[in-house]
């Protein structure tokens, strides 16, 4: 930082305590491979407890959590692993895994081509994983990810907020990101059926940062099938 304060240093790490490399004397951030596995596995096994466990371990409210206040590099695929569109068993989960990656603590990183759902498997080698594209494509997934990026960019809570689990089932999860100035609830429904969520929201209404629509918490919150929301709370 003393030599060039605006030069961001990030390291590629797999296992172990990331604090060994991510600290005031070394790197600003490292790749979050622990949550990479938890992200796709939670959808494929329909077990949101897995990714929630990792997020609580890394960023939860307890004093012992590993990386509270730090910003790991979040990703759902990269140049060394099977592309997420090829690893998910249900294509309806593709937008949702990005909503989870952008909503959780960390710096989301999108691998080129995956923003429109490019497919490739690790067993087919580097040429498949690192393909050349003639031009970018734009589809509904691209539009959705761009909305997630816009929401993340302008939200203090999504960038710097604490992490707290609010509601958790095998197929749904709601967690809170909170700073002194803003509170956002990230809600995911991975099921093919609507889900009525009952919890203490602490306020009456919110605005979904993805759609811009107002959400009323009165009488419960219905999550549509295969849906995600970033509810910015009224207080």
PLM features per residue range, with description:
Residues 75-78, 103-104, 151:
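Conserved catalytic core of Hanks-type protein kinase domains
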Residues 1-67, 100, 117-147, 151, ...:
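Active-site-proximal helices and loops of the catalytic beta/alpha 8
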Residues 66-89:
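Active-site clefts of carbohydrate-active enzymes
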Residues 94, 105, 110, 114-235:
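Carbohydrate-interacting/catalytic domains
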Residues 8-10, 71-74, 108-109:
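Structural preference for beta-strand elements that scaffold enzyme active sites
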Residues 13-14, 75-78, 114-116:
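Short, well-ordered beta-to-alpha junction loops that form the rim of enzyme active sites
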């Amino acid at each position: 930082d003393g030599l060039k304060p605006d030069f961001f240093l990030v390291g590629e790490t797999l296992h172990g305590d990331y604090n060994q490399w991510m600290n005031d004397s070394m790197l600003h951030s490292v790749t979050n491979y622990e949550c990479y596995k938890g992200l796709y596995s939670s959808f494929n096994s329909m077990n949101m407890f897995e990714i929630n466990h990792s997020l609580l371990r890394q960023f939860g409210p307890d004093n012992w959590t590993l990386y509270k206040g730090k910003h790991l590099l979040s990703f759902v695929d990269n140049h060394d692993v099977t592309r997420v569109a090829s690893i998910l068993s249900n294509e309806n989960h593709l937008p949702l895994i990005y909503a989870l990656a952008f909503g959780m603590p960390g710096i989301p990183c999108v691998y080129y081509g995956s923003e429109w759902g490019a497919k490739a498997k690790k067993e087919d080698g580097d040429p498949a994983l690192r393909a050349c594209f003639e031009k970018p494509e734009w589809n509904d997934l691209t539009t959705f990810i761009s909305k997630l990026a816009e929401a993340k960019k302008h939200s203090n809570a999504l960038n710097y907020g604490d992490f707290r689990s609010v509601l958790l089932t095998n197929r749904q999860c709601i967690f809170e990101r909170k700073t002194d100035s803003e509170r956002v609830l990230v809600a995911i429904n991975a099921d093919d059926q609507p889900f009525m969520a009952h919890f203490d929201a602490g306020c009456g209404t919110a605005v979904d940062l993805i759609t811009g629509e107002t959400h009323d918490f009165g009488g419960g919150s219905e999550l549509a099938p295969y849906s995600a929301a970033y509810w910015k709370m009224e207080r």
